[in-house]
Amino acid sequence: MEDLIIISNLNDFIFCPASIYFHKLYGSQDNLLYQSSAQINGTKAHETIDEKTYSTRKSAMMSLDVYSEKYGLCGKIDLYESDKKRLIERKKHVRQIYDGYIFQLYAQYYAMTEMGYEVKELFIRSMDDNKNYKIALPENDPDIQQKFEQLIAEMRTFNLETFYQTNIEKCKNCIYEDACDRSLNRGE
C-alpha cells in the first residue's frame, strides 16, 4: 500500500516540497519558535472549526476526518453543510484562489463522496471578509482535475535529495528559510 498523502500537504507541496520536511521536523516544537504571525493567525482563526464550535446547526459538520482510497489521501474537512450539500474550505484571508486551495477542496470532495456523502457545491471562504468563492466540481473543470492528479503523481515520486527551489520569492516568504540548505535567499 502506498503512503497516504495528508490533504493539507497538497498546498504545501506546491509552495515548496521541502517545507513539508521542515514542518514534520519542527512539528513537535512550540509553533511560536518557527511560525510566522500570518500562520499563527490562521491557526487561531481555525480553532472554531477544529474545536467544532463554529456553528451549532445540526446540518454543519466540522473537522470531519476523511479518507480517499482512490487517491490515497487523508485529512479533515473544514465544513460540510449537509442541508445544502456544500463543502467549504475556510482560509484566514483570500487574496486570490491558488490551485493548492482548489486541490485541497478536491481531495476533500473525493474523500467525502467515497465515504457516501453527496456534495453538490464547493466553496472557499475568506474568513476575514466573509467572502465565498464558488469552485467548479472536478467533473466540470477537466484542466484543474488533470493538474490535481498530476500533483498527486509528483508527490508520490518526489525525491528531496534532488530538489532545488527555483523561485526566490518562495524562499523569501518561507518560515523555514534559515534552516533550509536549498534556499535561494542566502546572503541577503
Listing of model-derived features with the role each one plays in the protein:
Residues F13-I14, I20-F22, Q29, Q108, ...:
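Broad hydrophobic/π-residue packing in well-ordered secondary structure
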Residues Q39-I40, L105-A107, L137-P138, L151-I152:
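Short, charged/polar low-complexity linear motifs in solvent-exposed/disordered segments
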Residues R86-R90, N132-K134:
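Short small-residue beta-strand/loop micro-motif enriched in glycine and branched aliphatics
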